[in-house]
Structures are given as structure tokens and as C-alpha cells.
Amino acid sequence: FKKFGEIYFSTIFENKIKAWHLHKESHLNYACISGSVKLVLFDNREGSSSKNMYQEIILSQQNYNLVTIPPNIWNGFKGLNFKESIIANCLTLPHNESEMVRKDPDDKIFNYRW
């Protein structure tokens, strides 16, 4: 954990998807504090050894982890197995809409089946 910028909580319902977004400068620190989610990361950074690769991580109260996501990694999540799940995100910078990029879940650059 590098530093504290802000924390927010995101609610997601079962089988719903919140994707895709990235932060150009901030590191994200996700933890699932209630329910269960599938967190998906996608790297399309030029020169990265993991370029065009996905990583799937199941977060829940039973599989409790803090996942740190560096800048410029696309991410999104899907609610699993619970009516409602809550994700905590502790960012390293205060909220700044101009350092975020958003895409639709079915955007063609991802080619990902939720």
C-alpha cells in the first residue's frame, strides 16, 4: 500500500457487471467486504510482458485479499452468488475524473466473455 488518496465503496448485484475502467495515475486497492465478485484485469500497455493478457481473481469474505492494481490496467468486476456485494477501493490519489478512462463491458478491444 503506497499512500492514501481516498476510499469509496461500490455495490454490485448478482450477475451484474461493472466494467471497464482504468486510472492513468492512481493505484487501486480492492477488497471485497461483503458478498463475492469476480475481478478481471486486462493489460494492454505497450511493452508490457503481460500485454493482452487477462487475470481473473475471485474476491469474497471467504477468499479475502487486498488486490493492488497499478495505473493503466483495465479492470472490472461481476457480482457472484450473493444478492449484493460490496467492494472497497482505497486509491492512492483523490478522485479526479480526468485521470480515469471508461469503456463499455462489451467494447471490442477486450474480447472478454463475462
Regions found by a protein language model. Give the residues of each.
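Non-catalytic, conserved peripheral segments adjacent to functional cores
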Residues: 1-66, 80-114
